[in-house]
């Protein structure tokens, strides 16, 4: 029996060792503090973002969703520029910042590098999309479409919904339905769909577990 065990270990030892290493890494990840998975800079903005979202959306506003979105957009870096020209914490293109400031003059002049302005404009812009995305199955699907619109434009979301309807799918459901349809370029499709899924299914639950208010609209 001992010889059989030695022979088995010689044949499968490497595989067993790799499995043990992966198991150890998984256990290590599970027992890491939730805050360790959130950029340290986020903590400095938590109180202000909570106040802004509750003012714009009500006391039950989805603070965790907005935090997850900023995490995805800029990793909480207020002075960052993207390769395509998006600016600041909420990564607005200059034309979008200007447009938001024009339709919401109470926000003052466009200031995408100002964290306060960027967070309020983000909450307002998300609300703008939310109000224009009716007839969805639930809050999860509506948030998915609102985030897709923030990333790629409301026009594209509306076109994708029409394609879903034409194919016999439910235009009120994003996941597994509308998300499958588009005429966007391949790179734009991949970026947009990852954007929505990563924010709602990965980052929002993380911020919720860390105590950011509003909860996660999608059950993961």
Describe every region a protein language model picked out.
Residues 3-20, 24-44, 95-124, 128-220:
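Non-catalytic cell-wall polysaccharide-engagement segments
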Residues 32, 51, 73:
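Short, histidine-centered active-site or binding-site loop motifs used for metal coordination
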Residues 45-57, 80-81:
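Peri-catalytic and regulatory segments of divalent metal-dependent proteins
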Residues 53-63, 135:
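Short, charged helix-capping/linker segments at alpha-helix termini
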Residues 61-65, 71, 84-87, 143:
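Extracytoplasmic
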Residues 71-96, 153, 199:
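Cell-wall polysaccharide-cleaving catalytic domain and substrate-binding groove, primarily
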């Amino acid at each position: 029996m001992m010889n059989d065990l030695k022979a088995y270990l010689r044949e499968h030892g490497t595989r067993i060792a790799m499995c043990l290493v992966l198991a150890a890494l998984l256990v290590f990840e599970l027992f890491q503090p939730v805050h360790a998975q959130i950029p340290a800079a986020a903590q400095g903005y938590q109180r202000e973002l909570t106040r802004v979202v509750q003012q714009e959306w009500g006391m039950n506003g989805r603070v965790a969703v907005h935090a997850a979105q900023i995490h995805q957009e800029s990793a909480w870096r207020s002075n960052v520029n993207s390769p395509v020209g998006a600016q600041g914490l909420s990564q607005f293109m200059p034309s979008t910042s200007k447009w938001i400031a024009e339709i919401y003059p109470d926000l003052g002049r466009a200031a995408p590098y100002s964290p306060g302005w960027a967070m309020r404009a983000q909450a307002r812009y998300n609300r703008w999309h939310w109000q224009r995305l009716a007839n969805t199955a639930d809050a999860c699907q509506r948030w998915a479409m609102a985030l897709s619109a923030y990333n790629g434009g409301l026009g594209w979301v509306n076109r994708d919904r029409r394609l879903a309807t034409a194919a016999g799918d439910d235009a009120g459901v994003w996941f597994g339905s509308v998300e499958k349809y588009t005429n966007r370029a391949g790179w734009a499709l991949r970026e947009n769909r990852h954007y929505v899924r990563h924010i709602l299914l990965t980052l929002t639950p993380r911020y919720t577990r860390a105590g950011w208010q509003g909860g996660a609209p999608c059950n993961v």
